[in-house]
C-alpha cells in the first residue's frame, strides 16, 4: 500500500482553499476523503468546491472547534478588491469573460433600445392627445430619438459594435439624459396670477397644457437611472458619477424651471421638505441601482466561471474516460470492457462502490439483476467456437539472460514484448498474457472474426521477423518457436482483484503443445488450423515423428497431423516494430464509441501512419514505434524500451509522438488530448504521466486558484481561456438556457425541485459564505437594502408633517412601528443565518431550517418587500385630498418600492405580481378618491384653512372642467406606471434567469466534478487491479519499474482436486469455473482486510492462487520486526484454509482440497508489457515457493527450511517432513503446518512421495511451471541468471515439466 502522502495524489483527493476575500492570497490543501456513501436528498446538490474561494474554516464541532472568520466575503471567485469596479484579478479571465458574455450584453442593450423606443412612442401618443400648443416641440425630438434608437439597434448587428460597445452605450446614455432633462426646461408664464380660482378659470378657458407632473417626470428619471445601472454596461464608477450628476441636474432644472401653468392646482414652489425628501428618493434609487449593478456583475462572472468549470470538467471527463478505457483494455478486450464501463456509466454510484464489493462487509454474494438473493457473484464467461490460439516461446532466452542483471532482463523483456504488443494490435489479435519468456494470444475471441487463423499466422510470422530485428539491434542470438491451434475456448475473468482476461479449454492446451513441439523460426500449426488457410503461405509437413520419435508423437499428438509455415509466398519484410502485417479490415472500429470525434480522428490518423511502415529501410521514420534502425551504428544510438516507455541509451529522452503532442504550444488542447489518449501503443508510464498531468491541470483549471506563483496562475488561466474559447457551450448557455421561456422554471423538474430546496440545503449544511452570490449572503443583502429603503422612505414621508408641526396619521405611525420592527428582526435573523448559524441553539437552527423552505421563505420575503409600499399607502389613505404636493410626492415615492422588487431575485416569480398590484392600487386611489365628498383645495393653505373654505368655492369647483387635471394625472400616472412595470418585468426576468443560470452552473460543475471523481476512483481501482499502487506511483517518475527485494514472502495455493470437479461436457465447463470464481473471490475478499494490506495478489494460474508480501518498501520499514510481513502472509495462508472449509460446507456433493507452498527470500519484481501490462515477480524464491506447492500435501502448508526457521520463532508448530527433490536445488528439507497430533494420524506415505515432474493442470491444461519462468533464472543472492545445461537438455525437460505456468491453459 502507498503511504498516505502518496495516496493523496491519486485516490479520493479533494482540493479545498481558503481565500482572503481579495483574491490575492490563497492556501491550497489536499484533504483525504474517506470513501463513504453520500446521503443525498435529490439528484442535484451543491457541494463545497475548491473553486469557491472559501474564506472560512468549517467548524469541526463542539465549542472548542475552529470558528469561521466573520468578515465580508469577496465579490466573486478570483475578484479584485475594488468593489467599485468589479472584475477578475486576471486579465486573461477578465478579457475572456467580457468576450464570452458579450452576446448577453449585446442582447440586453438591444432590449434597452427597444424599451426606450416603446417609452418614447407611448409618451408621444400621450402628448399628441393632451397637448395643443406645443405639439411640434414635444413630438419632433421624440421622433428623432426613435430614429436614433432604431439606427443604434441595427448597428448592434455589425462587427463594429463589438469594438465600440462602451462608446455606443455612453453616447446613448448622454442622448437619453439630454432628452429627458430637456423636458424640465418649462417656460414660465408670468401672466398667470397666484390665486387658485383665477388660475383655475384661466386653465378652464384654455383647456390645454403641455407638461408632465412631478410623478411622470420622476418616473422617467427612475427609468433612466435603472437603465444606466443595469443594461448600459458602463463601469460602476462611471455609471455612479453620471447617475449622480443626472439626479442633481434633474432636480435643479425641475426646481427652477417649473411651469406654473402645467397644473393650476399645483401652483407653488418646492418646499424645503420636498427638496430633501426628493433627495432621499434619489439616494434610494441609486442604492438600488448600485446593488443591481454589483450583483449582476457578480452573477455573470460567477456563471462564467461555473460554465467554464463545466467545460473544463467535460474535458477532464473525456480524459478520465479515455484513460479508464485504456487501463481496462489492458486487462480485458474492448467488448467486455465496454460492457463493464457502460454499466459503470449508467450506475455511477454502484461503480464508485465497486471496490467495496470485495470488502469483508459484503461477504454475502451479490446479485446484479435478480431481486431474490442468489449465492453466486456476478460472473461472465463465454464459450466461443472457431478461435485460433497462439503460443510463442523465446528459444535461447536462457543463454541470453545468463549474464544479465534483473533490471536489464526486465528491460529486454519489455522491449521485446512491447514489439509483440504493437504487433498484436496490428494483426487484430487479443493478447492474453506473458508467462516468463512465453507469449500467448488469441484471434476471434471475444469478438468472432472469420479471418482468425490468418491473424494468428500473421502474428506468428511477425514475431519471428520482430525478434530477428531485435537480435540485429541488440547483438543477441535468440529465436521464436510459435505454435497455433484452432478450436473452442472459454473466456472470461476470474476473481475480484488483480483480474485479467484469460482463456481455458483443451484446445488451449493443444496450442501450447504445438509450440512445445515446434521448430525455431517457423510457425507450427495443427491440421484444424490449416483448414482455414489458403495457399498464400509456404506450408510443409512438421516431421514430428522424425524429429521427436514415434512414441512422443503418438502419446501427445494422438495421430494429429501438423504443419510448419516458414513464411508467405509474397510476404514483404516489415520494420522492427512489425507493423502492417495484414491490411486493416474495412469497417473495423479503431476507436472507442465513448470517445469524442476528434479523439477518434486522432486514432484513425495513428492507424494510417502505421500503414506507411512496411520495409526495414523505413525504420528511420517508423511512426508507430519511433525506433531508428542502426545496424551498423554505435550501440548508444540504439533505442531500448524499459517499463513500457522508450528511452535512448545515450541518456537523453527520445522525442515521441506523445511528448510532441503535449509539449507543442501551437497545438490546441483538444488535439493534444486526442493524440495523447488514443495512441494504444502508449506505455503505462505514458498513461500515468497523462493521469498526473491532466488531473493536475483539472484541479488547477476547475478550481481556478491563483496558486502560489504568478506564472503558474497565468498559465492555468491562459489554458482555461484557450479551452473555453473552443467550446460552444458558453454561447449556448447564455442564449439557450435550460429554462422555460414563460414560467422561467427549469425544464428538468427534478432540477427545479433541487433549485427550490437549495437555500434550505445551504442552511442545513451551514455552508460558509464565500462570495456575494452565496444564497444566504444574497438574502442578507436583499433584506439589508430593503430595510435601508424602508428607513429612507419613512424619513422622507415624515419630513412634511414634521415641518408643519402636525402629527402624522395614527395608522401611519402604527404601521411604521410594526414594519420597522419586522424589518429589524428580519435583518438580525439574516445576519445570524449568514455568519453565526453554527452558534445558535439547536432548536433555533431547526426553526430557521423550516422557515428557509421555498414556501415559508417566499411568504416572509413577500411581507418584507411590501413594507415600504405599505407605509406609503398608509399616508395616502389619510392625506389624499388634503395637500396635493404631498400627495404627488407620495405617488413619486411609491415608484421606489416598485423598483425595489428587482432586488429580491429569489422572489422574482412573485415580484412582478407585487409590483403590478402596487401600481394598480395607486391608480385606483387616484381615480376613486377615498373622500369624494371633500373637494380638492388650494395647496398653499393649511389644513385648517382648507377645512374652513367658503361654500362659494364649492360652487366654483363644481364645474366639470375642474376634474380635467385629475383625469390627466391618472392617465399620466397610468403611462408612467406601465412603463415602469415593463422595465421591472424585464429586469426581473433577466435577473431571475441569471440567478438560475448561476445555480445551474453550480450544479453542472458539481455534477461534472462528482462524475470525474467517480471515474478517477474507478480508474484508480482498475489501476490497483493491474499493478500495485506503490508501483504505479513509481512509474509516474520513471519509465520502468524493476526492484530487488531482499526479504519477500511468496505462497502458491492450489485446488488440487479441481480436475476431478471440472467437466467440459456440461456447458463447456462454464459452471465449473463459476464455482472456482466464487472460491477465488473469497480469497480476494481476505486481501481487503486492513490486516492483510501488505500482501499483494500476483495472479491466478488456473486453480492456483499466487500472492506475495514484503513488496512495498514503505510498509517494511519497521527494523524491530523485519519479518512481520511473513507472519501476516502465513496467517493469510491459514485463513485461506478456513475459507476452503467454509466453502466446502456450502457444497452439496464435492469438497475442494487446498495445498499451499510457502517460501521467502530475495526476488525481483517488475512490470512488463505496454498495452497489456503485467506485474510479476521472479527469482529462486518464487521457484522454490512453487515447488513447495507442487511437492506438498493437500490441506497442509509446506514451508522451506529457511522459512521454517523464521516462522517457528513466531510460535508456529511444524512437522518435519523430510527431504524432497526440487529441480535445480536437489534435496531440500521441508516442513508441514499444521502439526499432526497423536490422534490425528500420520500423513499417508503416498503423499510423501509426491514429486511430479509432469502435472496435468486441474482444468485439463498443460502449462509451464513457474520454475521455468525467468524467475528461476535469477539467483537469489547476486541477481544473476543461471545457465541451463544446454539447449538440447532444455528442449527435453521443457516437454516434461510444463506443470503449471503463469496462466497458460
Swiss-Prot record:
What enzyme class is recorded for this protein?
lyase
Record: residues binding Mg(2+) 2: 393-394, 437
Species for this entry: Xenopus laevis (African clawed frog)
What family does the database annotate?
A: Belongs to the adenylyl cyclase class-4/guanylyl cyclase family.
**Source gene?**
adcy9
Domain topic, free-text comment = The protein contains two modules with six transmembrane helices each; both are required for catalytic activity. Isolated N-terminal or C-terminal guanylate cyclase domains have no catalytic activity, but when they are brought together, enzyme activity is restored. The active site is at the interface of the two domains. Both contribute substrate-binding residues, but the catalytic metal ions are bound exclusively via the N-terminal guanylate cyclase domain.
Q: Which reaction does it catalyse?
A: ATP = 3',5'-cyclic AMP + diphosphate
Q: What PROSITE patterns would the database entry show?
A: GUANYLATE_CYCLASE_1, GUANYLATE_CYCLASE_2
Q: What is this protein called?
A: Adenylate cyclase type 9
Q: In which tissues is it expressed?
A: Detected in oocytes.
Q: What is its EC number?
A: 4.6.1.1
Major localisation: membrane
Q: What does the entry's cofactor note say about binding and number?
A: Binds 2 magnesium ions per subunit. Is also active with manganese (in vitro).
Q: Which residues bind ATP?
A: 393-398, 435-437, 481, 1099, 1176-1178, 1183-1187, 1223
Amino acid at each position: 500500500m502507498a503511504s498516505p502522502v502518496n495516496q493523496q495524489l491519486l485516490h479520493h483527493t479533494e482540493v479545498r482553499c481558503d481565500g482572503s476575500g481579495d483574491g490575492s492570497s490563497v492556501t491550497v490543501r489536499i484533504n483525504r476523503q474517506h470513501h463513504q456513501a453520500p446521503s443525498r436528498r435529490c439528484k442535484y446538490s451543491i457541494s463545497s468546491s475548491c473553486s469557491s474561494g472559501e474564506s472560512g474554516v468549517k467548524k469541526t464541532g463542539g465549542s472548542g472547534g475552529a470558528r469561521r472568520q466573520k468578515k465580508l466575503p469577496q465579490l466573486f471567485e478570483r475578484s479584485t478588491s475594488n468593489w467599485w469596479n468589479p472584475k477578475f484579478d486576471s486579465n486573461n479571465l477578465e478579457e475572456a469573460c467580457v468576450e464570452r458574455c458579450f452576446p448577453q450584453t449585446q442582447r440586453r442593450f438591444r432590449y434597452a433600445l427597444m424599451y426606450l423606443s416603446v417609452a418614447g412612442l407611448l409618451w408621444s401618443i400621450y402628448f399628441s392627445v393632451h397637448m395643443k400648443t406645443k405639439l411640434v416641440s414635444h413630438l419632433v425630438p421624440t421622433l428623432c430619438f426613435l430614429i436614433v434608437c432604431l439606427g443604434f439597434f441595427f448597428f448592434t448587428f455589425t462587427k463594429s459594435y463589438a469594438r465600440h460597445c462602451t462608446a455606443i452605450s455612453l453616447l446613448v446614455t448622454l442622448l437619453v439624459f439630454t432628452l429627458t432633462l430637456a423636458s424640465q426646461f418649462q417656460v414660465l408664464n408670468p401672466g398667470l396670477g397666484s390665486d387658485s380660482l383665477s388660475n383655475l378659470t384661466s386653465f378652464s378657458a384654455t383647456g390645454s397644457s403641455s407638461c408632465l407632473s412631478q410623478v411622470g417626470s420622476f418616473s422617467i428619471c427612475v427609468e433612466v437611472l435603472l437603465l444606466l445601472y443595469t443594461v448600459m454596461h458602463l463601469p460602476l464608477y462611471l455609471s455612479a458619477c453620471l447617475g449622480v450628476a443626472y439626479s442633481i441636474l434633474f432636480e435643479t432644472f425641475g426646481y427652477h424651471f417649473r411651469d406654473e401653468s402645467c397644473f393650476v392646482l399645483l401652483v407653488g414652489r418646492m418646499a424645503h421638505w420636498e427638496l430633501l425628501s426628493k433627495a432621499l428618493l434619489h439616494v434610494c434609487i441609486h442604492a438600488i441601482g448600485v446593488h443591481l449593478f454589483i450583483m449582476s456583475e457578480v452573477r455573470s462572472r460567477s456563471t462564467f466561471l461555473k460554465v467554464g468549470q463545466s467545460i473544463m470538467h467535460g474535458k477532464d471527463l473525456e480524459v478520465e474516460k479515455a484513460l479508464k478505457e485504456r487501463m481496462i483494455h489492458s486487462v480485458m478486450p474492448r467488448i467486455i470492457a465496454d460492457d463493464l464501463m457502460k454499466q459503470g456509466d449508467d450506475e455511477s454510484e454502484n461503480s464508485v462502490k465497486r471496490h467495496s464489493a470485495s470488502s469483508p462487509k459484503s461477504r454475502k454474494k451479490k446479485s446484479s439483476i435478480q431481486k431474490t438473493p442468489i449465492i453466486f457473484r456476478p460472473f461472465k464467461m463465454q464459450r466461443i467456437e472457431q478461435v485460433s490460439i497462439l503460443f510463442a516461446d523465446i528459444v535461447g532466452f536462457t543463454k541470453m539472460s545468463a549474464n544479465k542483471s534483473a533490471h536489464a532482463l526486465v528491460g529486454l523483456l519489455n522491449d521485446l514484448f512491447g514489439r509483440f504488443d504493437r504487433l498484436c494490435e496490428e494483426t487484430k489479435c487479443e493478447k492474453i498474457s506473458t508467462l516468463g519468456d512465453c507469449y500467448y494470444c488469441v484471434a476471434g475471441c471475444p469478438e468472432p472474426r472469420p479471418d482468425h487463423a490468418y491473424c494468428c499466422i500473421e502474428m506468428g510470422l511477425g514475431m519471428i521477423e520482430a525478434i530477428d530485428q531485435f537480435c540485429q539491434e541488440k547483438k543477441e542470438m535468440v529465436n521464436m518457436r510459435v505454435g497455433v491451434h484452432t478450436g473452442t475456448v472459454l473466456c472470461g475473468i476470474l476473481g475480484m482483484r488483480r483480474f485479467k482476461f484469460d482463456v481455458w479449454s483443451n484446445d488451449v492446451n493443444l496450442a501450447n503443445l504445438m509450440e512445445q513441439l515446434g521448430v525455431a523460426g517457423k510457425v507450427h500449426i495443427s491440421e484444424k488450423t490449416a483448414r482455414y488457410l489458403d495457399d498464400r503461405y509456404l506450408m510443409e509437413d512438421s516431421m514430428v515423428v522424425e524429429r521427436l520419435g514415434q512414441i512422443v508423437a503418438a502419446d501427445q499428438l494422438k495421430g494429429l497431423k501438423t504443419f510448419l509455415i516458414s513464411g508467405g509466398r509474397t510476404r514483404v519484410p516489415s520494420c522492427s516494430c512489425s507493423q502492417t502485417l495484414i491490411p486493416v479490415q474495412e469497417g473495423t472500429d479503431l476507436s472507442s464509441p465513448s470517445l469524442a470525434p476528434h479523439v477518434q480522428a486522432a486514432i484513425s490518423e495513428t492507424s494510417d501512419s502505421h500503414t506507411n511502415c512496411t520495409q526495414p529501410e523505413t525504420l528511420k521514420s517508423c511512426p508507430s514505434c519511433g525506433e531508428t534502425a542502426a545496424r551498423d551504428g554505435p550501440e548508444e544510438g540504439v533505442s531500448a524500451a524499459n517499463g513500457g516507455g522508450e528511452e535512448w541509451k545515450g541518456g537523453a529522452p527520445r522525442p515521441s509522438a506523445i511528448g510532441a503532442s503535449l509539449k507543442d504550444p501551437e497545438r490546441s488542447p483538444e488535439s493534444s488530448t486526442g493524440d495523447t489518449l488514443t495512441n494504444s501503443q502508449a506505455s503505462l508510464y505514458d498513461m500515468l504521466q497523462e493521469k498526473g498531468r491532466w488531473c493536475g491541470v483539472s484541479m488547477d483549471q476547475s478550481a481556478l486558484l491563483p496558486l502560489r506563483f504568478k506564472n503558474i496562475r497565468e498559465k492555468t488561466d491562459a489554458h482555461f481561456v484557450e479551452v473555453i474559447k473552443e467550446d460552444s457551450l458558453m454561447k449556448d448557455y447564455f442564449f439557450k438556457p435550460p429554462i422555460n421561456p414563460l414560467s422561467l422554471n427549469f425544464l428538468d423538474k427534478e432540477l427545479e425541485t433541487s433549485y427550490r430546496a437549495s437555500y434550505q440545503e445551504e442552511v442545513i449544511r451551514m455552508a460558509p459564505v464565500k462570495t456575494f452570490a452565496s444564497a444566504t449572503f444574497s438574502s442578507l443583502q436583499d433584506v439589508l437594502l430593503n430595510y435601508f429603503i424602508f428607513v429612507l422612505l419613512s424619513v422622507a414621508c415624515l419630513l412634511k408633517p414634521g415641518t408643519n408641526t402636525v402629527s402624522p396619521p395614527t395608522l401611519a405611525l402604527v404601521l411604521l412601528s410594526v414594519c420597522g420592527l419586522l424589518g429589524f428582526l428580519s435583518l438580525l435573523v439574516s445576519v445570524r443565518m449568514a455568519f453565526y448559524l453554527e452558534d445558535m441553539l439547536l432548536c433555533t437552527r431547526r426553526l430557521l431550517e423550516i422557515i428557509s423552505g421555498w414556501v415559508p421563505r417566499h411568504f416572509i420575503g413577500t411581507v418584507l418587500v411590501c413594507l415600504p409600499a405599505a407605509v406609503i399607502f398608509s399616508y395616502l389613505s389619510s392625506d389624499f385630498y388634503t395637500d396635493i404636493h404631498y400627495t404627488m410626492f407620495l405617488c413619486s415615492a411609491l415608484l421606489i418600492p416598485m423598483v425595489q422588487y428587482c432586488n429580491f431575485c429569489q422572489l422574482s416569480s412573485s415580484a412582478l405580481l407585487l409590483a403590478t398590484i402596487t401600481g394598480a392600487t395607486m391608480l385606483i386611489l387616484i381615480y376613486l378618491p377615498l373622500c369624494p365628498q371633500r373637494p380638492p383645495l388650494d395647496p398653499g393653505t393649511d389644513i385648517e384653512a382648507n377645512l374652513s373654505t367658503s361654500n362659494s368655492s364649492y360652487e366654483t369647483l363644481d364645474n366639470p372642467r375642474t376634474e380635467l387635471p385629475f383625469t390627466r394625472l391618472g392617465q399620466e400616472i397610468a403611462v408612467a406606471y406601465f412603463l415602469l412595470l415593463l422595465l421591472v418585468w424585464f429586469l426581473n426576468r433577466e435577473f431571475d434567469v441569471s440567478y438560475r443560470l448561476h445555480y445551474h452552473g453550480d450544479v453542472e460543475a458539481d455534477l461534472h466534478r462528482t462524475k470525474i471523481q467517480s471515474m478517477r476512483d474507478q480508474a484508480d481501482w482498475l489501476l490497483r487491479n493491474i499493478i500495485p499502487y506503490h508501483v504505479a506511483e513509481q512509474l509516474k517518475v520513471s519509465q520502468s519499474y524493476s526492484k530487488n527485494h531482499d526479504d519477500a514472502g511468496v505462497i502458491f495455493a492450489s485446488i488440487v482436486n479441481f480436475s476431478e470437479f471440472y467437466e467440459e461436457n456440461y456447458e463447456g465447463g462454464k459452471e465449473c469455473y463459476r464455482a472456482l470464481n466464487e472460491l477465488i473471490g473469497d480469497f480476494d475478499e481476505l486481501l481487503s482486510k486492513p490486516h492483510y494490506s501488505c500482501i499483494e495478489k500476483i495472479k491466478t494460474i488456473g486453480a492456483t492462487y499466487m500472492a506475495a508480501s514484503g513488496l512495498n518498501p514503505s510498509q517494511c520499514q519497521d527494523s524491530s520486526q523485519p519479518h512481520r510481513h511473513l507472519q501476516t502472509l502465513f496467517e493469510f495462508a491459514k485463513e485461506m484454509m478456513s475459507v476452503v472449509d467454509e466453502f466446502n460446507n456450502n457444497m452439496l456433493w464435492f469438497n475442494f482440497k487446498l495445498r499451499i507452498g510457502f517460501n521467502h527470500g530475495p526476488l525481483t519484481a517488475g512490470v512488463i508489457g505496454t498495452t497489456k501490462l503485467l506485474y510479476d515477480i521472479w527469482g529462486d524464491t518464487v521457484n522454490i515457493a512453487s515447488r513447495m506447492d507442487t511437492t506438498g500435501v493437500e490441506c497442509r502448508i509446506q514451508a522451506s527450511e529457511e522459512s521454517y526457521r523464521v516462522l517457528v520463532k513466531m510460535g508456529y508448530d511444524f512437522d518435519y517432513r523430510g527431504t524432497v527433490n526440487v529441480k535445480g536445488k536437489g534435496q531440500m528439507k521441508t516442513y508441514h503446518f499444521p502439526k499432526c497430533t497423536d490422534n490425528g494420524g500420520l500423513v499417508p506415505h503416498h503423499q510423501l512421495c509426491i514429486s511430479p515432474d509432469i502435472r496435468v493442470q486441474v482444468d485439463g491444461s498443460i502449462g509451464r511451471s513457474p520454475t521455468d519462468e525467468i524467475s528461476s533464472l535469477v539467483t537469489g543472492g547476486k541477481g544473476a541468471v543461471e545457465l541451463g545445461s544446454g539447449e538440447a537438455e532444455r528442449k527435453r525437460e521443457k516437454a516434461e515439466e510444463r506443470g503449471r505456468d503463469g496462466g497458460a491453459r
